[in-house]
UniProtKB/Swiss-Prot annotation:
Residue span of region Head domain (RuvB-H): 256-339
Broad class of enzyme this protein falls into: hydrolase
Subcellular location: Cytoplasm
Annotated Gene Ontology cellular component terms: cytoplasm; Holliday junction resolvase complex
Chain intervals for the UniProt region annotation (Small ATPAse domain (RuvB-S)): 183-253
GO molecular function: ATP binding; ATP hydrolysis activity; four-way junction DNA binding; four-way junction helicase activity
Top-level taxon: Bacteria
Residue sites binding Mg(2+) per the record: T67
Binding positions for DNA per the UniProt entry: R311, R316
Record's comment describing the protein's domains: Has 3 domains, the large (RuvB-L) and small ATPase (RuvB-S) domains and the C-terminal head (RuvB-H) domain. The head domain binds DNA, while the ATPase domains jointly bind ATP, ADP or are empty depending on the state of the subunit in the translocation cycle. During a single DNA translocation step the structure of each domain remains the same, but their relative positions change.
Name of the protein: Holliday junction branch migration complex subunit RuvB
Protein encoded by which gene: ruvB
Region (Large ATPase domain (RuvB-L)): 1-182
Length: 339
């Protein structure tokens, strides 16, 4: 296999397929119940006051529904949503162009907000607090500041790395929520809903097979469903059963535990090349031929969650379950596990 399925799925922007399955309302959004309750309360309170929502920060791993929730909030409020991302706002003029296009009550959604340049953040602070934009015209002794009043708006920021947000920016959000991985039952419900929208019959056991390999992530679940649907159409009778789902996912080298080829290469490198660790992330990235940030964002969270590896102050360490998974004998002294 070439590029990891999970890398393609979690790092790629939302496709037309993803958008077609996106729930439009809180009532159709499965999972994240506590966050949904908070957001629905905020929306109702703002509606009763006839005011705009406070600024909201959504953090968590990719594919858990941050963008979907931002759109649901806009639908619930009945306002427009303007979408951009941190890397797209390269200079103050880019931010000014976005902010001056807003109308009262609009939502500005900034994905990857942790990637905003610190200089851009300085312009964002008065916009968030006082709905004011201060622009510096000219340079040197001729420099002067022009103040533009902005309509009251809501900033919804999304980040996969909340720790990279500066403290001043983080403190300006009225509500900060971290999305968690989804349970097996929640993923089954999402898969069955998506299958219904796609007019694909799926057995409960077939949905479970897909859910078990979805890494707690709806975007992965829907991408796997898309592949299994195609497999069922060509190799089966169109119905997604337990056996058919198993065969379809085995074909793309995703095993019963949800590990793909890159996951196994990562574990093999830790065990056989680095004697179980501890090993640094950059060394691992070179050993498996993958970008370090991809390993950290896409593969490590699942492997840590499943108990295959652990992070220690000295580096990554392969845990006993990793040796068992790869059919290797654990070191007798259990090196690294207690570091």
């Amino acid at each position: 296999m070439g590029e990891s399925f999970y890398t393609r799925t979690t790092e790629a922007p939302s496709s037309a397929f993803d958008l077609s399955l996106r729930p439009p309302a809180f009532s159709e959004f499965c999972g994240q119940e506590k966050i949904k309750d908070r957001l629905m309360l905020m929306v109702e309170a703002a509606r009763q006051r006839d005011d705009v929502l406070d600024h909201i920060l959504l953090s968590g791993p990719p594919g858990l529904g941050k963008t979907t929730l931002a759109n649901i909030i806009a639908n619930a409020v009945g306002c427009r949503i303007h979408t951009t991302s941190g890397p797209q706002i390269e200079k103050a003029g880019d931010l000014a162009g976005v902010l001056t296009n807003l109308e009262k009550g609009d939502i500005l959604f900034i994905d990857e907000i942790h990637r905003l340049h610190p200089a851009i953040e300085e312009y964002l602070y008065p916009a968030m607090e006082d709905f004011r934009l201060d622009i510096i015209i000219d340079q040197g002794p001729n420099a002067r500041s022009i103040q533009l009043n902005l309509p009251k708006f809501t900033l919804v920021g999304a980040t996969t790395r909340a720790g990279m947000l500066t403290s001043p920016l983080r403190s300006r959000f009225g509500l900060v929520n971290r999305l968690d991985y989804y349970t097996r039952e929640e993923l089954c419900a999402i898969i069955e809903r998506s299958a219904g929208l796609l007019n694909v019959p799926v057995d409960p056991e077939g949905a479970l097979q897909i859910a078990l390999r979805s890494r707690g992530t709806p975007r992965v679940a829907n991408s796997l469903l898309r592949w299994v649907r195609d497999y069922a159409q060509v190799r089966g009778d169109g119905v997604i059963t337990e056996q058919l789902a198993h065969d379809a996912l085995t074909m793309i080298e995703i095993d019963d535990d949800g590990l793909d080829e890159m996951d196994k290469r990562l574990l093999e490198a830790m065990i056989y090349k680095f004697n179980g660790g501890p090993v640094g992330l950059s060394s691992l990235a070179v050993a498996v031929g993958e970008d370090a940030s991809t390993l950290e964002d896409v593969h490590e969270p699942f492997l840590i969650m499943q108990g295959y590896i652990s992070r220690t102050p000295r580096g990554r360490v392969a845990m006993p379950s990793a040796y068992l998974k790869m059919g290797a004998a654990p070191p007798a002294n259990g090196q690294g596990w207690l570091l």
